[in-house]
Design a protein with these regions (language model features):
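ATP-binding/phosphotransfer module of carbohydrate and carboxylate kinases, centering on a glycine-rich
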Residues: 1-58, 180-343
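Short glycine-aspartate micro-motif
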Residues: 4-8, 61-65, 101, 135-139, ...
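Short beta-strand-loop/turn "lid" adjacent to the catalytic site in phosphate-handling enzymes
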Residues: 54-102, 107-122, 137, 291-295
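Active-site nucleophile and cofactor-binding loops and adjacent substrate-binding regions
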Residues: 34-36, 79-83, 101-108, 126-130, ...
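Glycine-rich phosphate-binding loop of actin/hexokinase-like ATP-binding domains
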Residues: 123-126, 131-195, 199, 294, ...
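Residues on a specific face of well-ordered alpha-helices
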Residues: 44, 89, 108, 142-146, ...
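Short, electropositive alpha-helical surface patch
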Residues: 117-128, 203, 338-343
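Short, acidic Gly/Pro/Ser/Thr-rich loop/turn segments
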Residues: 14, 71-73, 143-147, 204, ...
């Protein structure tokens, strides 16, 4: 039976796994985690993995799909946080693989969505999905991922998007104040959507509220917020957004307000993008916040702004929203795409 090779390539860690095509969904055979920085390139890592895992699994993979943290153009990808330049044809030759495809690590989720089971998802909003219509996946994590899926005779086709880097459009005086504060605090000429609508954005919203209401640093989150800001994007940066979510769950007023503002901005952006591509095939929410903030996504704080699109509210009302709660969805989706490559 054919084997599939799937990889989720990130700046910190890389997951490589072997799968069997299976029936309705690929079946995991084995998986190994690697520290990306320990390797000069992806090819030697893959060769090492196949030399050890291949004999155990029963052969050489017939197809491989690697989800990479960065844009992919013409079968080539330059990773955002690694000095690697990947080429699908070169990887195929170097690793002895018949078929290799590189896909952006968020766009690849499109290929996994039709095969997710109930344990990998959670309903956010009930609705009626049109299987012939486009679908949309958004993921608020460190940044904001956006991708569309178009139904074709050969299955879904993933369309990457950089919509998260559009301009953040304030809807209220509070959001306007937040945007101006971020411009000054981050020394930026413009504020993109993902500066607010992302896990990182939740941290920024909390910092803004702390600056406005507790300038003397007397709030329990003041210290963590200062350390988080000073750490920049370093690997030892504490998780301020998680601390804000925990404080909100404990009914801290400032943290609850930060989460409410963030959910409203997220819901509004989801509604805007759902209208942009008329995603009657459904809206899927992935990323690190989907499972952690499920109650918030089901609340009026998120769903009210999602639907608040004037005359187009009726277009969004039937649209189902589903959260992807499986942390391993990246490699699973890459395996689904590798199976598609076999035709």
């Amino acid at each position: 039976m054919s084997l599939l090779l799937a990889g989720d390539i990130g700046g910190t860690k890389t997951l490589l796994s072997l799968w069997r095509p299976g029936g309705e969904r690929p079946e995991l055979v084995l998986e190994e985690r690697f520290a990306s920085a320990d390797w000069q390139d992806l090819a030697p890592m893959v060769r090492h993995f196949l030399a050890v895992a291949g004999p155990v699994a029963g052969g050489v993979p017939a197809a491989a799909c690697f989800a990479v943290a960065g844009p992919v153009e013409g079968g080539r990808a330059r990773l955002t946080n690694l000095p690697w330049v990947l080429d699908s044809a070169g990887l195929a030759r170097s690793c002895g693989l018949p078929l290799v495809e590189l896909v952006n690590d968020f766009a690849v989720l499109i290929y996994g969505l039709p095969h997710l089971d109930a344990a990998q998802t959670a309903p956010v909003r009930e609705g009626q999905r049109d299987p012939q219509a486009p679908l949309l996946v958004l993921g608020a994590g460190t940044g904001l991922g956006v991708a569309m899926g178009l139904p074709t005779a050969a299955g879904l086709r993933a369309i990457p998007s950089e919509a998260a880097h559009g301009e953040f459009a304030p809807r209220s005086a509070a959001e306007w104040d937040l945007k101006q504060w971020l411009r000054a605090d981050l020394a930026l000429e413009r504020i993109s959507i993902e500066r607010v609508v992302s896990g990182t954005g939740l941290g920024h919203v909390a910092r803004w509220l702390l600056d406005r209401h507790h300038p003397g640093g007397d709030h329990p989150l003041s210290g963590p917020a200062r350390l988080w800001s000073e750490a920049g994007d370093g690997p030892d940066r504490a998780d301020l957004p998680a601390a804000v979510a925990l404080a909100a769950a404990a009914r801290d007023p400032l943290a609850a307000r930060a989460l409410e503002l963030w959910l409203g901005a997220y819901g509004s952006v989801c509604g805007d993008l759902a209208l942009a591509c008329l995603s009657r095939g459904g809206l899927w929410l992935a990323g690190g916040t989907a499972a952690k903030l499920l109650d918030g996504l089901r609340s009026e704080a998120f769903q009210g702004p999602f639907l608040n699109k004037g005359r187009l509210r009726s277009t969004l009302e039937p649209m189902p929203i589903t959260a992807v709660v499986d942390p391993g969805v990246g490699t699973f989706s890459a395996a689904c795409r590798a199976r598609m490559l076999l035709g």
